[in-house]
């Protein structure tokens, strides 16, 4: 049975940082190293990002840029702690920001759906950038409020394709309550895990990632033959773990935050793997890649988008929505694909649409909307 997307809401933290200021912040945190500073500048300039939102108070950014200490934040560069804040300090910030930002996205989605919050039967939360319990799910139940008897599921630590896993979970759980609304919320606070040491493979993530949250209200199509309010209907999904790629992208808990490694081999792997796999998936639905009107591809970075455009013969402007979202908010991990779908809906993008995400594994997730 198909799954209707009734609405999508999104939210970003208040602290807005241009890519130029983000580079200055990185250079200040990392300290002097002439050759590496030049390399870092090229990385930040080549990301296709104009600005990002960070889950810290604005005074923290002002302090780093001006060399002051009004905020007394653990995120300020400290000689006695060269690796930056501890994981606990980063998780304290995650707990402060995660619930309220998820709440903003949820309120937006619920307002657009006209669904009574107390009628939500299933709640799915998605995040890979932090932990605390009682968590985001219970924050939403208290503050929206939702029914205290809503059934909860958490999709955790799956990386940038996590929202697609959340949508798949919503599809399955919606079958338990036909015709009743399901809420799926993804929220990430990647900037809390900025790396403070000169390790190039880990510093690329500092240049790419931002923070944000998005929410979807969904409902199984049974009993609702009319088109959903967004016109977005999930027809199917697929998943693929690429062989011999385990170490190309990793996301692990460390003593000073979570650490990501990104191999420069990933774009070549995408070009090699994606065409055959996606063609097989679409064939199961009577489609070919040429039938797809738009591709909502998670913008892991400009080189990933280039690789997808080449692999699928989309041309240079084939992923304009993905590049626009990357420029406006950066790579915000799991919610990013929801931001892209929201943008497509606002400009009334014709169907079908395929959403794609990439994560540690290397894993590829796809969702087909018709």
Q: Residue locations for each model-derived region?
A:
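Claisen-condensing/thiolase-fold acyl-transfer catalytic domains that form or cleave C-C bonds
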Residues: 93, 103, 110, 128-130, ...
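Residues that mark the start of a beta-strand
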Residues: 4, 119, 151, 179-181, ...
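Short, well-ordered amphipathic alpha-helical segments that serve as non-catalytic structural scaffolds
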Residues: 45-49, 97-113, 169, 213, ...
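Glycine/charged-rich beta-loop-alpha catalytic/anionic-binding loops adjacent to active sites
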Residues: 85-86, 118-122, 144-156, 196-201, ...
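Conserved beta-ketoacyl condensing-enzyme motif
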Residues: 43, 47-145, 289-305
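Condensing-enzyme catalytic core mediating Claisen C-C bond formation in acyl metabolism
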Residues: 1-93, 181, 190, 196-272, ...
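Secondary-structure boundary elements
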Residues: 111-118, 173-181, 219-230, 286
